[in-house]
């Protein structure tokens, strides 16, 4: 719908504005799961252990009590470096219940990656597995000088005995999750929270370009997006639906879907710590999963893998794909394979939008569309050349305003002002348009950001890594299309004068410093000079399609 404001064109949602509850996230969650105490809310996909709503609610409050005993204060940060585990849910909500902030990162991150993500928000507490602790313990005081307590969470195959030994030998800094929740769940204060100003979580995003930044999302941001999404998505769920929980909880897509939306709606979530396609299919069959939230690489497996035919997936009703665009070709292949019985939907968003802004309504799918604008939001589409507001059907940068727009980037006013304009619109960096039915189409993803397996890989981060090598004079990183993976990083390097360096030497040096999905699967090429504009901006597009010989 078009709205004219001061002579400028804006677009509103087809849905009427909704009332956003004025409650902190954990209060909202506890209210809903306490109403169905005997329902199975979580299932450990490795051990098959089931957790009732009553147990989860009690454990949330026990985490709050445990943190209160550790003297947590409003605004203190608890860094979560965990794979998907049932304990993630009470740790997340228990921290928020005490007015704390959870900051979530990939447990596969190296020390170097943790140092410029989680360490930048000065966490007072960490929640980790034994494997993560072993990785960080020697650098703990250097990388995390602010940390006072490390909470070790058990995982299948790891014994409590191992954790117990660590708690006795680490100068009191380490405790087990079981020690944290060894209380009655009653002794914690009610913390007053400013819903619109107080940060609840700090996930990390690169925005459209640059290094990763902490994204400050308030309780109001999260509650708003929960209800905005439910307005469109409620008809897609049935009362006793079971959902697969394989998307990473540290990613805003998985966080909002499983830790908030599904838990609030009371759907049982079958949790997988690490994605394995065969186990994933087996769990769908075993638990008669109805809905699975996926990323395009998983969609491609559904479309093409012969393994799919070995499982009874008749319970599966809907696949919801996000984090990166899903091609129409893959969508058609899945529909053909499942004889049209499987609904495939997409949405669009960003970490900075908490995360959803467009969702395809049930039964109203339009090919190639990112969906319809969720309620309580305003859109303007601006010309990349002139900055003027454009009309229906005209292609420009999509900008979003609403209660789901982030507070800002953590301790980075400059970066915040670059993406949120003076009127409060978040500039997505993506080019698109809206049609006469209110469906939005993304025609050009942010040019610089590499999307690998649904994860964001900022070229600037990898360029900084390459440039730190003593023999590298200049570097540029671009995304290379790579089938099921989406895009993979490809590096271009200028070697310092009078130095010699091979691709293998550089890869062997770089890969241990970065997560697996950031590896240079597109290779590293050596060239005489990196193309740049007159202002010194890297001309990545000039390098996208060239394949120079490797030295």
Swiss-Prot record:
Pathway: Phytoalexin biosynthesis; 3,4',5-trihydroxystilbene biosynthesis; 3,4',5-trihydroxystilbene from trans-4-coumarate: step 1/2. CoA binds at residues 274, 453-454. Keywords: ATP-binding, Ligase, Magnesium, Nucleotide-binding, Phenylpropanoid metabolism. (E)-4-coumaroyl-AMP binds at residues 253, 257, 323, 346-347, 351, 447, 451. Its cofactor is Mg(2+). Carboxylate--CoA ligase that may use 4-coumarate as substrate. Follows a two-step reaction mechanism, wherein the carboxylate substrate first undergoes adenylation by ATP, followed by a thioesterification in the presence of CoA to yield the final CoA thioester. It comes from Dictyostelium discoideum. One of its GO terms (molecular function) is 4-coumarate-CoA ligase activity. Its EC number is 6.2.1.12. The gene is 4cl2. It catalyses: (E)-4-coumarate + ATP + CoA = (E)-4-coumaroyl-CoA + AMP + diphosphate; (E)-4-coumarate + ATP + H(+) = (E)-4-coumaroyl-AMP + diphosphate; (E)-4-coumaroyl-AMP + CoA = (E)-4-coumaroyl-CoA + AMP + H(+). Pfam families: AMP-binding, AMP-binding_C. Both substrate-binding domains (SBD1 and SBD2) are involved in the substrate recognition, and are sufficient to confer the substrate specificity. It comes from the Eukaryota. Residues 276-346 are annotated as: SBD1. This is Probable 4-coumarate--CoA ligase 2. ATP binds at residues 205-209, 213, 346-347, 351, 430, 445, 537. It is an enzyme of class 6 (ligase). Residues 347-409 are annotated as: SBD2. One of its GO terms (biological process) is phenylpropanoid metabolic process. Belongs to the ATP-dependent AMP-binding enzyme family. PANTHER family: AMP-BINDING DOMAIN-CONTAINING PROTEIN-RELATED, LONG-CHAIN-FATTY-ACID--COA LIGASE. The lineage of its organism: Eukaryota, Amoebozoa, Evosea, Eumycetozoa, Dictyostelia.
